[in-house]
Amino acid sequence: MSDTELPPAAQPDLFPEQEDEVVATREPLTARRVAIVGVRLVAGVVGLGVATVTIAASVLLPLPTVSSTPPSTLVTPVPTAQQQVCPGAVLRLADDTGQGATTSSALGVPTTSSASSSGSVTRSPLQQSDASTGGTAAAPVVISTPPNAADPAEVILLSGAQSQQVNEGDFVGLAAATCSAVSADSWLVGGSTAVGRTTLLTLSNPTEVPATVDLELFGENGAITAPGTSGIVVPASGQRVLSLAGFAPDVVSPVVHVTSTGGQVTAELQQSTVRGLEPGGLDIVGATVAPATDVVIPGLRVDDLASVQTLLVGGAGFADLQTVLRLYAPGEGTVSTTISVIPEDGVGTGTSFPYEFDAGRVAEVPITDLESGNYTVRIVADTPTLAAVRVSNAAPAATADTPAATDFAWLTAAVPLTSTAQLTVATGPSPLLHIANPTTAAVSMTLTAAGGEGTIVELPAGASTSLPVEGGETYTLSGYDTLYAAVSLAGDGMIARYSAQPSGAGSDPIRVYR
C-alpha cells in the first residue's frame, strides 16, 4: 500500500460515473447462479401455497369436537301445602258502641266452607288483627291442605268461600268472597270514599315473616299521593285494617295497587253505604286480574230491576244504584276499548259499543237499558286495562218515599281457567254458577259435585250460561281448554258475587347442573 492509498474502510464516496465503472467490473451472473435463484423463488412460492392451503383447510374442513354431558341431578322440590286465606268478618270503622272512629271491629262471624281433593283441610285463624279479632272465629281464616308425599307433582285442589248476612244498624246487606292465595302484587277495583260511603282496606299475612306493603292509589283525577302509603308492616299471621279515606278522601272511583316484600299478603276492600239514615248495602271486594287487553266479567245478575229503577228516578242519593263499569289503565295516552254486555243463553238485551278513556285516570261507564237476567261483560282494549262492574239489588217494596233494603256487589274480572279447577259455593240465597266461553271454539266441560256424578255442559263459542248450585258444596270443573267462572248469590235486597280461582301448582322435578 502506497503512502497515498487509503484503507478500504476509508474509501471516499463514489460519484455516479465512478459507480458505473465499479458495476462494470462485478462478476457477471452465471447459469448456475440463475438456477439457484430460480430454485429459491419456487421454494418460496410453494411455501406460500402450502400456508394458504393450510389456512383454508382450517376454515373449511370440520374440526374435531370434544363434548361431554355436565353432571346433573333431577331434584323434586320438597312439596308444600296448598294454602289460601278467607277474608274474615265484615268490619266497621268503630267499636260496638259506635265510638272509636279510628279503630275497627267485627260485625258478627262469617260462614266459611272449604274442601280439598285430598280430603284433608286444616283451618287456623290469623293471630293478630287491627280489628281485635286475632285468634277468634271473626278473624281471617287460613285453609291449607297437605301435598301428596308419594307424588309431589300431583296438583291438590283446594277451595273455600265465605258469606255473611249483616243486619246491624247502618250495616245491612250480604257479603260473599272466595278464599285466595297470597300474592306480592295485586289490584283492587271497587269501593268509594264519597259522602256516605266507607271503604276499608284489609291486608292479611298468613306467612311466618312480616310483610312490608306499599300502596299506589288512583282515582277519577289520576294518581293520588298521600303520606303513609309505603312501608306498611303486616305482622306474620296478622291483619292490618286501614281506612281508605285516610289516604284518599272524597274519591268516587278508587283503584288500589298493593305490592309487598318479605311475606306475601291477600288484600280486599270492604265497602258499606249509608244514604242519609238508610243503610245502602255492603260488600267485600277481592283482588282482580292484572291489567289485560281482554277482560271477562261473568255473573252480572240483574234482579228486581223495577225497584232499582224506581229509586234511581225518584230518590236523592241513589245514583250509585246504577249498574256501572269501572275502568283503569296504567300509563298515559288514550285507551280505546270495545265493551260488550252478552246475555246468558241468549236471553235478555245485550249491547256492544266503543269507549275511549284516558290512561292514568279511573273512568266509569254506566250500563243502562238492561232487562232482568244474567250477563257476561267483556272488555277488549288496545292497552292493558283493569275492570270491575258494580251492580245493585233492591227489595220489591222499595219506593222513593219508603225505600226498602238495597244492596250492591262489585264484580271483579275472572282469571281464565286453563286446567281442572275446584270452587266452593258460599251459603246464601239462590246461588248460581256462571260460566263464560269468550273463545272462538265450543267448550264441553264437566261439572262434578263432591261425591257425585259429573254433568256435561256444552257451551258454544262466545256464549255464557249459569247453573243452579248448592250453597256450602264444592264442585270440580274439568274437560275444557279455557273458560271463566263465577258464583253469585241474590235475594230481596241482597246480592253478592265472586270469581272462581285457578288451581295451585304441584312440585314438578327440576334438573340441577353441578
Task: State what each model feature region is.
Residues 34-51, 56-99, 163-202, 268-330, ...:
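Conserved functional hotspot residues at active sites or interaction interfaces
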Residues 130-173, 202, 206-207, 233-283, ...:
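Hydrophobic, ordered structural segments
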Residues 203-223, 260-261, 318-348, 380-381, ...:
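Short acidic, flexible loop segments centered on an aromatic residue
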